[in-house]
Amino acid sequence: MRGLEGKITVVTGGAAGIGAAIVQRFKAEGARVIVFDLKSDPSVDITNYEAVQKAVAAAGPIDILVNNAGWDMFRPFLKTDPAFWQKILAINLVGPMNVLHCVLPGMVERGSGKVVTIASDAGRVGSSGEAPYSACKGGVIALTKTLARELATKGIRLNVVCPGLTETGMLESFMQGAGNPEKLREAYRRAVPVGRLGKPEDIAGAVLFLASDDAEFITGQTISVSGGLTMHG
């Protein structure tokens, strides 16, 4: 895709799953990729503002940011507690805000930048057993729209990608915990109009498009990559 070669690109949560697929696609396009992850070297905890500041300073002028890091555990809301909420909020909402707050000033100064945040269709339509997570993902969608308006004249484009049911470790853990994972996998597959679950590479393709020069006239948008499981007007 146009305009990715040589771009300094930060991917949070890029050590595994969807994040790792995004990293590989950017590298294939010639981007210089830096991973912010607890498992990266050096490790970066996005819930720690000072740690993010240091990592951003060390990265140099960041052209593209992919806010991908996230975590969830499926629990009915009435069986959760404030400590659980705080953990979900710290990783899925405060973490992306920390990274944005540290990265965006440099983009504003240079007059250009692309930001793609990975949310979830849980933040658009809700998802049973994911109340705090859904709230966070709805929050980052609203945050992105607001920042897209604030920074549109500064040359910065911010958009959201919402994965649907995607083959990741988090989904696998949920299915194993629910019992009879193969039966559940087949039920999920039948629910998706295109007839399969998503792959991390499916999400990566959408992210790269939004980060490329081909998406220069797109900002403040939320794109579901769900095989048609959710369809939004």
Residue map of PLM features:
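Active-site helix of classical SDR
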Residues: 100, 136, 144
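Alpha-helical segment proximal to the catalytic Tyr-Lys
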Residues: 105, 149-153, 216
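Residue(s) in the substrate-gating loop at a strand-loop-helix junction
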Residues: 120
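Substrate-binding pocket helix/loop in short-chain dehydrogenase/reductase
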Residues: 76-77, 84-89, 188
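Short C-terminal tail/terminal secondary-structure segment
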Residues: 125, 208, 219-233
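Short, flexible catalytic-loop segment of classical short-chain dehydrogenase/reductase
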Residues: 158, 163-173, 177
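Active-site loop immediately N-terminal to the catalytic Tyr-X3-Lys motif
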Residues: 78, 123-131, 153-154, 195, ...
